[in-house]
Amino acid sequence: MNPLILTIILMTVFLGTMIVMASSHWLMIWIGFEMNLLAIIPILMKKYNPRAMEASTKYFLTQATASMLLMMAIIINLMHSGQWTITKVFNPTASIIMTLALAMKLGLTPFHFWVPEVTQGISLTSGLILLTWQKLAPMSILYQISPSINLNILLTMAVLSILVGGWGGLNQTQLRKIMAYSSIAHMGWMAAILVYNPTLTMLNMLIYIMMTLTMFMLFIHSSSTTTLSLSHTWNKAPLITTLILITLLSMGGLPPLSGFMPKWMIIQELTKNSSIILPTLMAIMALLNLYFYMRLTYSTSLTMFPSTNNMKMKWQFETKQITLLPPLIIASSLLLPLTPMLSILD
Amino acid sequence: MMTYIVFILSVIFVIGFVGFSSKPSPIYGGLVLIVSGGVGCGIIMNFGGSFLGLMVFLIYLGGMLVVFGYTTAMATEQYPEVWVSNATVMGVFLLGLLMEVMLVLYVLKSEEVGVVFKFSSVGHWAIYDIGNSGVFSEEIMGVAALYSYGAWVVVVTGWSLLVGVLVILEVTRGD
């Protein structure tokens, strides 16, 4: 793509999310979402194969539908409260429709069907932007309307998302689909704690973005999109193999890595609010996630996966430089001792 | 009938939308959009927005739909689909009509749901208001407010339109 056009389009994606996060007028928020959607379509369609076209079309259709639902909720809110500012949404109809619209944008169950298909059809870098940056805007709106969200709907969607994210990822060998299902599960964890303590949602979002960034950077470095090609990294760059191990275990939520911090805090907050069965179920379903991360580490770092002999002697091309990989690795594995610093997120 | 004119016009509006949502060939979709645009203009004018109704006719129908009509005329096929040519299209159209008829009956017969006659103004929430003077029309004041207090909205929408054109050019380039 022409560098000038690419700059303008990336700037508009950034501007769209910033407008959503910084606006106090509901119409500007809707405009920000639409601007974001419009500008990310050519980024998703960077490669001109039919798979990418189909993925971009699916993304556009689902996000446009969600924007329309959001607009309807905004207008119902306007009719009942007479004003356009972002506050607690007092009317229950508007609140429910808004929650459903934002869940569609995030990819929570039962609106999760587009996430694996869209993530699989696009390149790794586009998938990175899709799974990290695009989650910021809807989550910030959910944060702002969190006092008025219907608890039953949100918790149902959250628990089902954790289940679907874990269960659906079990049969996958394509790395982008694995990351998509992992994203669905993490969004479920974030949505579950939103009503009780929104600060933890922001913490989970932060840690999730850092871990997903790290994983995608490692995949881009080894140019691998399937489990099989990931299992050849011991030949290309053995250090990457170790880093994949650490980051995947962190994503699974194992202490003493930083992925444990959000899960621990969320379970603690939920039990403080006297719900015991729910966090138990959530923790058990996170094991499904851990299973397929472990399978990836088993085939990549812990064993030499069976391959043909010519794969065992790889020609060393010039190494790709990856942005910011060392800080990201540190952030996604060693942040657990900094847990008392949670108070800065308030 | 005049008290219900907004209701009748909005029913025709929705029927028009059902007409092109059932996906006949784009030429017929454009035809229905002309009808819907004209009817929408009528709805706006019934609330006192004569300037905005004129804008709909000039810019939307006279600019965008004309360009759309020319491009679809260039890309049309030999036997374009009408609403009655394909069982699926006709089925969807009839289903949409049926839903609309049921909704109209519900609105007219039920006691809870009523027909909107007049929007109440935003009261003292608006920062740019003419009060109850009755001399200036509210919508002209709204347009004026857009270019003074709402300059940021103009910047954002102008930028969105520019990026929209760039995105469309980029997507259709194909390479």
From Swiss-Prot, chain A:
Any one GO molecular-function label of the UniProt entry: NADH dehydrogenase (ubiquinone) activity
Classification via InterPro entries: Complex_I_Subunit_2, NADH_DH_su2_C, NADH_UbQ_OxRdtase_chain2, ND/Mrp_TM
GO CC terms: mitochondrial inner membrane
Membrane spanning stretches: 3-23, 25-45, 59-79, 96-116, 122-142, 149-169, 178-198, 200-220, 237-257, 274-294, 322-342
Domain of life: Eukaryota
Biological process, per Gene Ontology: mitochondrial electron transport, NADH to ubiquinone; mitochondrial respiratory chain complex I assembly
Pfam families found in the cross-reference section: NADH_dehy_S2_C (PF06444), Proton_antipo_M (PF00361)
Keyword flag DNA repair: no
UniProt family annotation: Belongs to the complex I subunit 2 family.
Subunit structure as annotated in this protein's UniProt entry: Core subunit of respiratory chain NADH dehydrogenase (Complex I) which is composed of 45 different subunits. Interacts with TMEM242.
Role, per record: Core subunit of the mitochondrial membrane respiratory chain NADH dehydrogenase (Complex I) which catalyzes electron transfer from NADH through the respiratory chain, using ubiquinone as an electron acceptor. Essential for the catalytic activity and assembly of complex I.
Protein name: NADH-ubiquinone oxidoreductase chain 2
UniProtKB/Swiss-Prot annotation, chain B:
Location within or outside the cell: Mitochondrion inner membrane
EC number: 7.1.1.2
Transmembrane segments: 1-21, 25-45, 47-67, 88-108, 149-169
Subcellular location, principal: mitochondrion
GO molecular function: NADH dehydrogenase (ubiquinone) activity
Family from the record: Belongs to the complex I subunit 6 family.
Functional summary from the UniProt entry: Core subunit of the mitochondrial membrane respiratory chain NADH dehydrogenase (Complex I) which catalyzes electron transfer from NADH through the respiratory chain, using ubiquinone as an electron acceptor. Essential for the catalytic activity and assembly of complex I.
Protein name, as recorded: NADH-ubiquinone oxidoreductase chain 6
Species: Equus asinus
